[in-house]
């Protein structure tokens, strides 16, 4: 963060993926009326339930220094149609970069782990090409990869936000439909609902997703 503080056009981004389960209940403490403790009911999925049991989600915790010298922070989320793979990672980064550019940023210091969909040839090739075009055109946000040590997810500050988020969206007595769970998560993180990653959508020419995936 000290490095970002000396470069006002840089942003620090902590990226990670998480599964939001419709069944698993988080451990939590809660206030309750005397003699009426909160009880989390174990849920089951009906055979005709069309929704998946868990929803995969990409997240980027973005930190930067505001003009007044204070640290600013926000979290961006995108749910996935399926599971995290290289193509979804590329789509997520391609979505984040214009948002950073609109905020006046020129570089993203991207901190993430060594998941296969982060370090794949497809993702690394896309980042190289993306940075090449940013340099050639003088427009856009350059991405600087910063990998976390292997098997050290606790070093990513977005991890505790996932844990707190799961406590905030819990429903004690009924099974949440996928759409309602997504809405609750977005409300908990104060971010708008977006289309699922992985759905067909037009992309700019330089953001075409390579065929290779993790």
Question: Would you name each region that the model predicts?
Answer:
Residues 1-95:
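Extended, low-complexity cationic-aromatic segments
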Residues 36-48, 130-160, 173-175:
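RNase H-like polynucleotidyl transferase catalytic core
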